[in-house]
Amino acid sequence: MSQPEPEVPVRAVLFDLGGVLVDWNPRHLYCRLFTDEAAMESFLATVCTQVWNEEQDAGRPFCEGVELLVARHPQHADEIRAYDARWGEMLKGAVEESVAILGELRARGVPLFALTNWSAEKFPLARARFAFLEWFDGILVSGEERLKKPDPRIYRLAVERFELEPAETLYVDDAEANIAAAALLGFKTHRFVEPPALRNLLVSCGLLPA
């Protein structure tokens, strides 16, 4: 009788940043610019949308994206321009429990990498603010590569650049589409919801002590 294939151990962790280690949300800014929550949500759903923002994540300059929207929605010109000019106010802070986990992994010598959908223009603001970004052995920023998740090419680029074995790498992200794309390429994956669940998984993988 054939024996089951042994479980391949996890040797490295590849992290998403926003929503996992960093609390980024445009609402942190726009709740100050709108007195009415419904109006704010309508603006984010129909003007400065997630799809529009992802174009900057994929390399489009903010000045180009902003002026495109101002031409379409001149009544919201000030609010649209604030997305660029006051972008730093969308960063509420670090997800401290997740950062603590990252620090424990680092202390144990686990190779750590990041793969993030982030504007190349705005990522220096994150580097200046979050010292823990220096803990990574490598960070791949979508805006610098002009590729964004869940495009399979950006995962393949991470594999090549960081010399990863997907079957030995745990990918952590809060977006289901990104998790699904990584899984198709052979990564072990974890859909991030809260730090305790991530910690439990890392313990079960043998990367953190019980």
Where in the sequence are the language-model features?
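Asp-based, Mg2+/Mn2+-dependent phosphohydrolase catalytic module
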Residues: 2-13, 119-210
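N-terminal helical cap/lid subdomain that shapes the substrate entry/recognition surface
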Residues: 5-100, 107-108, 119
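Generic structural signal for small/hydrophobic residues in well-ordered secondary structure
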Residues: 16-19, 59, 105, 114, ...
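Alpha-helix C-cap/termination motif
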Residues: 72, 105-108, 129, 161
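Residue-level marker of regulatory loop/turn positions in helix-turn-helix DNA-binding domains and
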Residues: 94, 115, 147
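Short, proline-enriched alpha-helix->beta-strand connector loops that line the catalytic pocket
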Residues: 108-110, 135
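Proline-centered loop/turn at the N-terminus of a beta-strand
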Residues: 111-113, 188
